[in-house]
UniProtKB/Swiss-Prot annotation:
SUPFAM superfamilies: C-type lectin-like
Sample GO molecular function, one term: hyaluronic acid binding
GO cellular component: apical plasma membrane; basolateral plasma membrane; cell projection; cell surface; external side of plasma membrane; extracellular region; glutamatergic synapse; lamellipodium membrane
Protein name: CD44 antigen
PTM comment, free text: N-glycosylated. O-glycosylated; contains chondroitin sulfate glycans which can be more or less sulfated.
Sugar attachment sites: 28, 60, 103, 114, 124, 184, 266, 274, 306
Residue ranges, annotated region (Disordered): 172-213, 232-252, 264-404
Residue ranges of domain Link in the record: 35-124
Amino acid sequence: MDKVWWHTAWGLLCLLQLSLAQQQIDLNITCRYAGVFHVEKNGRYSISRTEAADLCEAFNTTLPTMAQMELALRKGFETCRYGFIEGHVVIPRIHPNAICAANNTGVYILLASNTSHYDTYCFNASAPLEEDCTSVTDLPNSFDGPVTITIVNRDGTRYSKKGEYRTHQEDIDASNIIDEDVSSGSTIEKSTPEGYILHTDLPTSQPTGDRDDAFFIGSTLATIATTPWVSAHTKQNQERTQWNPIHSNPEVLLQTTTRMTDIDRNSTSAHGENWTQEPQPPFNNHEYQDEEETPHATSTTWADPNSTTEEAATQKEKWFENEWQGKNPPTPSEDSHVTEGTTASAHNNHPSQRMTTQSQEDVSWTDFFDPISHPMGQGHQTESKGHSSGNQDSGVTTTSGPARRPQIPEWLIILASLLALALILAVCIAVNSRRRCGQKKKLVINSGNGTVEDRKPSELNGEASKSQEMVHLVNKEPTETPDQFMTADETRNLQSVDMKIGV
């Protein structure tokens, strides 16, 4: 019986922990630099665009602007986490790192959809201009709610309170759903109104650290910035050309995105566009350090009837796997989070390259991008393959993103846990009742003196004639009728009269 109650208590404890997990939020915050600080929720990318605004509002702050982020960067603020600001998703970087912002420095802008989940940055206008690491002890603008919100400061101090800060029901319902949207960039090309996207394969001229594998990222310059070009590339009469340099190492590729402004949009939209895709088998590289896989490579070709030069946009997305064979992409982390992004105030130095400075007003301009890793599993490879479409109006190559898989609702998980616990309790009660009902008891009638404990075992376990008696209780009902009772009474009366006469 004790074991049954122990299992019951253990099941209730597990159920309680499951319920509490749905009602706990940990907010890790950093020091403030010119009022800007970083907020991470539950140790992973789990904040939506709408929740980011609500969270900053709960801290009595706002989402920072790009100018405020650049000022914080100059004050020494840098992270390795993507976070929301006003209108963008960025990473502030001071020192180059191969796994942070594609080895770029400055405020690295990510071209990401608003449906993805990241961290967030907030701006406190009343904070000091320099670094401020005082502990945050309250969420002043939160309202009543059942959620336990814990603020974890940089020095490890923790402050908890009951409440809620989210104002959108979809953010509350999706609080425990891991974001599987890979629209953060590497395999999904966002349509850009500036012009066409021309992909060119180049050999890696300078491996970065131990990450000398092939990576892909598409970037654009948000402001006037220096843009490195490979010296082997030649441009004649500003015509769109296709060139394929020789790969010094077939396993080391670099994806370069070239954007060119279409001078004559009317002539382009007037003519048809032919799109072809040629799937190529993936290859493996066992030197890769992370848990990433190889998606299929696709080749897209566009032909213009009025142009003497054929444009070929070849997109080779090389993913490498070591031993990880899962079908779901890992959660974006500080070490591996890749997306098609934009570089603002970014600076990189590469040998054998010439630097060219151009602005957005130029007729044609090309960006050279550094590699960055992006985790993606095989489950998304088949979705992203062969779903490319041409937009004749804007002349932009767009690729549809992978659809999200349906998530199991939280209430269904809780209901299943309750049913399982009730079933376990019912089985335990049934087993215990069966044991009790099946027990046999012995009736011992002691015919001697003294209690049962005082008698010898031999007397109790001896013959039935000496130690036990069978007791039969017989309920005998009277069989005589009332008439018979009357006859007997009259007979007794007559006998009594005769005796009196005789006397």
